[in-house]
A protein has these predicted regions:
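C-terminal substrate-binding subdomain of Rossmann-fold SDR/epimerase-dehydratase oxidoreductases
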Residues: 186-256
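Histidine-centered active-site/metal-ligand motif
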Residues: 9, 66, 182, 218, ...
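Short, flexible, glycine-rich and Lys/Arg-enriched loop motifs at helix boundaries
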Residues: 32, 162-183, 195-214
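Pocket-edge positions in alpha/beta enzyme catalytic cores
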Residues: 44, 56, 83, 175-179, ...
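Short-chain dehydrogenase/reductase
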Residues: 84, 131-139, 173-185, 215-216
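N-terminal Rossmann-like NAD(P)+-binding domain of SDR-like oxidoreductases, especially those catalyzing
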Residues: 1-165
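Basic phosphate/pyrophosphate-binding loop/patch that engages nucleotide-derived ligands
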Residues: 99, 147-151, 180-191
Length: 256
């Protein structure tokens, strides 16, 4: 997933630290122009277990950052088989490829949506209660990671993202995926007069202005969390489950 929005920001920070990075991306939702030229790019996907295992062994790869997933919440409800195949079975295939190799650290891209409909703040000890199918696929992905970590002595960091926004200060990468649901990106486009209006969905939430409240995190900070988590599990030999947000929510109208 190194050719995607979040993945490209993580890679940018890794190569700045002179870490040898290999990107595996089928570019179905990623973009070749987001692929960092200082990393080794291999076009392919996680379903080709033989190819993935060969890449791991040939290059003595010891850490995997797994970002390959579909992430459209509405689409997931319509095309459950597609999301089951990619997000759940894809994770299973990747873990199979890691067996009996040099891999010792796994970073998994999860989601705060696994908690379900929560009022107020939530910590990592709260029992997951996924409501939608996308959330369910992320929850199952976490279970797969934990199962293989226990069986094959991996260390993992499961990172539960809240809402991600922003772009690298390098001005070379950013959020270019076509999406109707990314509020901050849509407002930026609208403010540049490239879009006639932004439609706000939902005005009857139990909030001060009736619109949904979300915790937004800058993508560069989220990328830093991946690097720090990798460093932690590598040095401490302990696994982690972390919420990734600032702990402060903003309503849709606040953002507007």
């Amino acid at each position: 997933g190194g050719g995607g929005y979040i993945g490209s920001h993580i890679v940018e920070k890794l190569v700045k630290k002179n870490i040898n990075v290999f990107i595996l991306d089928n570019l179905v939702t990623g973009f070749k122009r987001l692929v960092n030229k200082k990393a080794t790019f291999i076009k392919g996907d996680i379903f080709n277990t033989t190819k993935v295992k060969m890449i791991i062994i040939k290059n003595n790869i010891d850490s995997i950052i797994h970002l390959a997933a579909y992430l459209d919440v509405s689409e997931a409800e319509k095309y459950k088989q597609k999301y089951n195949q990619n997000n759940i079975k894809g994770t299973l295939k990747l873990m199979e490829a890691c067996k009996n190799s040099m891999v010792r650290n796994i970073i998994f891209s999860s989601s705060c949506s696994i908690y379900g409909n929560v009022i107020g703040s939530v910590n990592e000890r709260k029992k997951p209660n996924p409501q939608g199918y996308y959330a369910y696929t992320k929850y199952k992905g976490e279970q797969i990671i934990k199962k293989y970590a226990k069986a094959y002595n991996y260390k993992y960091a499961i990172l539960r993202y809240f809402n991600v926004a922003g772009a690298s200060s390098s001005n070379k990468i950013g959020e270019i995926q076509k999406s109707h649901g990314h509020l901050i990106k849509n407002l930026a486009i609208q403010s540049l007069k490239k879009k006639p209006q932004v439609v706000i969905y939902g005005d009857n939430y139990d909030t001060k202005d009736g619109t949904c409240i979300r915790d937004y995190m800058h993508v560069s900070d989220l990328a830093d969390i991946h690097l720090k988590s990798l460093d932690y599990i590598n040095k401490k030999s302990k696994s982690l489950v972390l919420n990734c947000g600032y702990g402060k929510g903003y309503s849709v109208l606040d953002i507007v």
